[in-house]
Amino acid sequence: MYMKITKIDGVSHYKKQDKGILKKKWKDLDERKQREKIEARYNKQIESKIYKEFFRLKNKKRIEKEEDQNIKSLYFFIKELYLNEKNEEWELKNINLEILDDKERVIKGYKFKEDVYFFKEGYKEYYLRILFNNLIEKVQNENREKVRKNKEFLDLKEIFKKYKNRKIDLLLKSINNNKINLEYKKENVNEEIYGINPTNDREMTFYELLKEIIEKKDEQKSILEEKLDNFDITNFLENIEKIFNEETEINIIKGKVLNELREYIKEKEENNSDNKLKQIYNLELKKYIENNFSYKKQKSKSKNGKNDYLYLNFLKKIMFIEEVDEKKEINKEKFKNKINSNFKNLFVQHILDYGKLLYYKENDEYIKNTGQLETKDLEYIKTKETLIRKMAVLVSFAANSYYNLFGRVSGDILGTEVVKSSKTNVIKVGSHIFKEKMLNYFFDFEIFDANKIVEILESISYSIYNVRNGVGHFNKLILGKYKKKDINTNKRIEEDLNNNEEIKGYFIKKRGEIERKVKEKFLSNNLQYYYSKEKIENYFEVYEFEILKRKIPFAPNFKRIIKKGEDLFNNKNNKKYEYFKNFDKNSAEEKKEFLKTRNFLLKELYYNNFYKEFLSKKEEFEKIVLEVKEEKKSRGNINNKKSGVSFQSIDDYDTKINISDYIASIHKKEMERVEKYNEEKQKDTAKYIRDFVEEIFLTGFINYLEKDKRLHFLKEEFSILCNNNNNVVDFNININEEKIKEFLKENDSKTLNLYLFFNMIDSKRISEFRNELVKYKQFTKKRLDEEKEFLGIKIELYETLIEFVILTREKLDTKKSEEIDAWLVDKLYVKDSNEYKEYEEILKLFVDEKILSSKEAPYYATDNKTPILLSNFEKTRKYGTQSFLSEIQSNYKYSKVEKENIEDYNKKEEIEQKKKSNIEKLQDLKVELHKKWEQNKITEKEIEKYNNTTRKINEYNYLKNKEELQNVYLLHEMLSDLLARNVAFFNKWERDFKFIVIAIKQFLRENDKEKVNEFLNPPDNSKGKKVYFSVSKYKNTVENIDGIHKNFMNLIFLNNKFMNRKIDKMNCAIWVYFRNYIAHFLHLHTKNEKISLISQMNLLIKLFSYDKKVQNHILKSTKTLLEKYNIQINFEISNDKNEVFKYKIKNRLYSKKGKMLGKNNKFEILENEFLENVKAMLEYSE
């Protein structure tokens, strides 16, 4: 049973309302009619079937455009046989059998291998090549009608019919296997407690196996292992051995192995004495062989078919073939263990799904009240769990920030009492002094009453604690409570946050700053320097600030709109796109700054004004769709490009449907349309849809700008500076204060709780979470016909609070006056004897002391004593990565030599009565040479000069980033992403753990069930405090359930190894420690026994030994994450004596490459030194 419901042309599966049985829709149709509908759908996809099973067309052409009549005739000949429908597109005389061997033109697929039979029936073997030969020899020169009457043709037709029928039978069987064949049964008539009843053989088999494992828990040997030992595949492996010893040609080996597999499976299927469990086991064997012997795998492992030797070595590896005295032998024990592991994996996934369905049936209001459980409902479960993992990541970041306030991480700091030491009169937790770091999170914390600081800190602590418990408990967030000490009784009592006047007052104060913050955002983007007061006033007569912005799926973000607008303007200087005209990226600095300002003004209009208006005007949207199509066609005609017709195949818009539904539907249809092409072609064709949607929104946005003359100034070019004397420019912002108060209620404890929580997390993280919330909201609205809350909280509240936090959060960057700088630095750093020694000591970790001794920019102000705050670098301190990164950077500090190199670049000489630095001269030279290239007037020598200039500019940029510690910040971002990813994986493991416990609970004795219930829903502790489910409690609870521990752990840890030790009652603390190491970010804080990030990845892979997909994703996600930073990483496997696979970095890290002028001229985006930094960070341990 999979958490997926197969759907083919309307055949879906759902839960029957009256009995809770999950079975096929179309319950009134008999099996024959169901098969007819599936066959009709299959025939509609026949083109993709032929491509997949028989053909790979050269240069990815479609068959209709194929000029070679050999290829075309063969294709349509097969199509007629496959569909059993006549077509007039083939001539037998055009088919040349030699093309069957041309690997560049036709590749035979799964049932269609070189010199291997195509179909077998009893003892008869049908070779496609022989059948073709017989037909061609007899009637090659005859017309189609005579060919169709020929015996050999009719034989082929019959074979294809059997072939297709077998495919459809397998598909129907797959549907039956993939549907959820379960029945809920009430464990207790009076309570909503459910168990599971299977309703088909496959589910019954797994159900009975699970029951047997749990009930026979006192057996000495694992029941599962004992059953697997009885599944003997020795004879099959011996036959495979013979093939590898007798054959050398790769396609013959593949074909014969697959034939042997089919014979073996068929024999076992016909042998009714084999039990159902063994049949499932044989299917796992079949999947393993077919996957690794597929054309797709051959292509990937042989470098696109260029080196079959590499693929042959791969096959030997996955078949565990060892060379002994020049004879190839399969290590049968290793191979058997591999299939055993895959079978166990499948088994555990079924158990997980049992538990997951039971949990949601009992606890989720939507699933509990759902009459028919369909695909969309399972998608809802999956989407909700993904969002829960995202929020678990935020909890770890928030808790880490809280730790950074106190400097302590041992134990659980959340929800613990904050005390005030009477001796030192400072805030303390344990023995660690609380430093004044509140400024990092609550900028004006002086407004808090000094006597209330302890209560405020407790409020922050409990705000995180409450969210953590809600995420861990899976149901809903119970927010707004905290505990404070009662003065009279000296006991801690529970209190509502809306009764905390300090927090409520601060919230009201920040809410009142929204208008000022919006103004500051515009002023910080320098609009007052590039636009006159009149133009600014015109702009703000139009602009309307929205704290809750509307979003829809697939709508392009503004970065894509800008890029599309720039590209289309540069195409023959099309005046329609004047709002997006760009200067050369290497033009004068002031022009680049102007573009930033103009684009910011456009972006604010795009999200706040345009979006809501555009999505509400269906008639206008309809016209724009037609306009975009016509314009694309015209551009294609002018440039004589066939791409001009790419938009014509996309459906027009019908005003009867919502705009968001239309955009979603054209994406979906395009994915279905390109299904018939290979993967590379899918990516190319899917891009047409993205381009189409981008042009629709771009055209709509331009129309919006054009209709209001007050905004026409935004297409004007920059000429002179305005207000260059720093004159204050004032303007009014259109803000609906009542609407803001409607969302941001100071008397709502939940709102205050989430506000404190989000305030402890970096803006980037909460912004990413907001995007995930929007996807969740859009999914529930579209698929479930109603917007769902998330953990009991409306999505709009999350969105509004996150926008509020990001907007009103103070930026820790350099201020406009040195007096304000000094004030800010005084709050952030300890001042000792009129010197900022703490600041200097931190800088020494990353910068050579000789550089700091002069106390100059960019680290100190002009008074040579006041520190300059580097905002991004400050984040490493705020979020606790600074200490760890200083260890990584100890051998890569910014040096005196690098400073001298920057000074050389910045040396100025007088040129044409203007002083220009060396770097400015290089930038001017690059612009000049680039213009020559655009005019086709550049020489080869000048191209080389251009590329050398580019390298020097890149070197300068790297040195400047290093000087300003941007490289450290980039490492901080990368490290944070890796830590977040690990938290998400561990949260999934904890969820799986809980679901498995739920699944096995129904098989336990009543006494043990009570213990499990206590484990899943712990009672309040002795102090009356609510205790929530936690995997870390396992050591003290589950081990008390008689006999369950060993068998249970054998299900989760299939290899019985973790951190190179056996999991048993005595050392459960090992993996509990690893869980805490990940969840509490101990990697940043422990002074010794650090587990490297690569080792963490390996341990996570071991932890998910029961889920191969997740194991693969752990590795892949590491690569994907680093690719985001332009880093390419390769792994290799080292195998220790205990046969525990470990991945390590292969050789070194590599930078992605950027393009330069000239053919094949590229440069590495990242410097080697930075790549070494990243490698050191990934491998660092103590």
Curated annotation (Swiss-Prot):
Can be used to detect RNA or DNA with atomolar sensitivity and single-base mismatch specificity when combined with isothermal amplification, allowing detection of virus, bacterial pathogens, to genotype DNA and to identify mutations in cell-free DNA. Additionally the reagents can be lyophilized and reconstituted on paper for field work. Keywords: Antiviral defense, Coiled coil, Endonuclease, Hydrolase, Nuclease, Repeat, RNA-binding. Its cofactor is a divalent metal cation. Residues 366-508 are annotated as: HEPN-like fold 1. It comes from the Bacteria. GO terms for molecular function: endonuclease activity; RNA binding. Residues 965-1120 are annotated as: HEPN-like fold 2. GO terms for biological process: defense response to virus. Pre-crRNA processing is metal independent, while crRNA-guided target RNA cleavage is dependent on divalent metal. Target RNA acts as an activator for non-specific ssRNA degradation. It is an enzyme of class 3 (hydrolase). InterPro entries: Cas13a_endoribonuclease (IPR053395). CRISPR (clustered regularly interspaced short palindromic repeat), is an adaptive immune system that provides protection against mobile genetic elements (viruses, transposable elements and conjugative plasmids). CRISPR clusters contain sequences complementary to antecedent mobile elements and target invading nucleic acids. Unlike many single-component effectors, this CRISPR-Cas system targets RNA. CRISPR clusters are transcribed from pre-CRISPR RNA (crRNA) and processed into crRNA by this protein. Cleaves linear target ssRNA in a pre-crRNA-dependent fashion, preferentially before U residues. The target ssRNase active sites are probably within the 2 HEPN-like folds, and the 2 folds interact in vivo. Part of a type VI-A uridine-preferring CRISPR-Cas system. This is CRISPR-associated endoribonuclease Cas13a. The gene is cas13a.
